[in-house]
């Protein structure tokens, strides 16, 4: 029996417990009431009386060895389980919503505008946002002392000789000048981009905004062609039931000139603070390209004619989505921008 006890003790010492399954197997084999150790205790009655005390002592040592190993393994595995649990994802917790980004409403509407005019045959031209006085004013029929310059409050960057002042462009019309200087007619382009004006910030105006201008030069182009283009654009942009009105206006670079209005989207024409109680909102200016502008770009106005138009993209965004404050488009308020997430 002594050999059996010593062999079993060595077996217990060598038993590797690394998992909960190993622990349970050890317990069932050695320490339960029907385990190997309990079975040996049951065999003590068959041992010679003189050997019983010594065999009993060996069995007690065997049981202590097994119990100690079992306790140590339980504590070790419990610590490992606790550490593992602290890093484990609790699947019962409510999920966290991750918001995906989306296209800004200004860029979305600008993309639609580009698509509409591209379908009409217009190309796309861009130019620098930092311009000279010559491109921004002089070549567009704004003489240095002409009062029309007061219509566009300008951010000047540097000031030098007349015509060479560097400024932030007040419209994308300088891009049209560059196109007319670089290309020969016929010309059909749109010019999207950011523009800057030193204006008071309000619900209807901002110091920086997005503009899209168009230019078409060919032979025998008329004001009727201009109206047809604008009506076609408006119906695709605002819906087939859109109402427009043309008002006579003045721009140094077009003659005749007009402004185009649509019915106020908030009040339906009844009058509100957004439309200044008029019931109408201006969406663009337009007109026939002034002969002086053509001459400045080396184009003969006796042979060629054309029209131009320009609109605020941000104003169109307000119309499309019924937003009553243009400042919301520039403040990066996620509460507003998340509404445009697809």
UniProtKB/Swiss-Prot annotation:
GO terms for cellular component: cytoplasm. Mg(2+) binds at residue 255. The keyword Hydrolase does not apply. InterPro entries: aa-tRNA-synth_II, aa-tRNA-synth_II/BPL/LPL, Phe-tRNA-synth_IIc_asu, Phe-tRNA_ligase_II_N, Phe_tRNA_ligase_alpha1_bac, Phenylalanyl-tRNA_Synthase, tRNA-bd_arm. GO terms for biological process: phenylalanyl-tRNA aminoacylation. It holds the Pfam family Phe_tRNA-synt_N. It catalyses: tRNA(Phe) + L-phenylalanine + ATP = L-phenylalanyl-tRNA(Phe) + AMP + diphosphate + H(+). Its main location: cytoplasm. The keyword Ligase applies. Binds 2 magnesium ions per tetramer. Its cofactor is Mg(2+). Its EC number is 6.1.1.20. It is found in: Cytoplasm. Keywords: Aminoacyl-tRNA synthetase, ATP-binding, Cytoplasm, Ligase, Magnesium, Metal-binding, Nucleotide-binding, Protein biosynthesis. Coiled coil: none annotated. One of its GO terms (molecular function) is ATP binding. Tetramer of two alpha and two beta subunits. Belongs to the class-II aminoacyl-tRNA synthetase family. Phe-tRNA synthetase alpha subunit type 1 subfamily. This is Phenylalanine--tRNA ligase alpha subunit. It comes from Pelodictyon phaeoclathratiforme (strain DSM 5477 / BU-1).
